[in-house]
Structures are given as structure tokens and as C-alpha cells.
Amino acid sequence: MSRSLRKGPYINVKLEKKILLMNESKKKSVVKTWARASMISPDFVGCTIAVHNGNKFIPVYITENMVGHKLGEFSPTRQFRGHAGNKKK
């Protein structure tokens, strides 16, 4: 279910502040965040954000196609090992 239009998108305040400061200074550096639920806004385009997946930080380069999605969508938390197969004798 999508978020109410009355509430607006959720963007972590600290993350947004770091991105705005980085855009003003025109220095491109990786920003670490644990805020996987934050929505990607147009201000984030061109930045690299390291999103925590529970174990390590996954660097995510933000493009225009990612606007409107959440940061956690681009940092998988589980590793698929494959289904069980037939054991050969």
C-alpha cells in the first residue's frame, strides 16, 4: 500500500541535510546511511549513497530512474543460495 498524499514522502532529515550540503559544495563523496525506508528525491540524483543491508554498506549510485523508489530496494538483505536439488550417488 502506498503512503498517503497528505503525509508526503518519508525522507530521513539527516540524510537530506547531508545531500544538500554536498550539492552546495559540489564535492562528491559517499554518504553512509541506515535509512533504508527513505524515498529517493530528485536532489539525490548523481550522488552515491552507501545503504546498510544488515551486514555491510552497499554503494548505490542514484540515477533519474530511481526517483520515487526507496533506498532499501537497491540493497538486498538476503542471499539466494538456490533450491535443493537431487543428490547424486
Swiss-Prot record:
One of its GO terms (cellular component) is cytoplasm. The keyword Glycoprotein does not apply. It comes from the Bacteria. GO terms for biological process: ribosomal small subunit assembly; translation. The keyword RNA-binding applies. One of its GO terms (molecular function) is rRNA binding. It holds the Pfam family Ribosomal_S19. Keywords: Ribonucleoprotein, Ribosomal protein, RNA-binding, rRNA-binding. Protein S19 forms a complex with S13 that binds strongly to the 16S ribosomal RNA. Belongs to the universal ribosomal protein uS19 family. HAMAP family: Ribosomal_uS19. This is Small ribosomal subunit protein uS19. It comes from Azobacteroides pseudotrichonymphae genomovar. CFP2. The gene is rpsS.
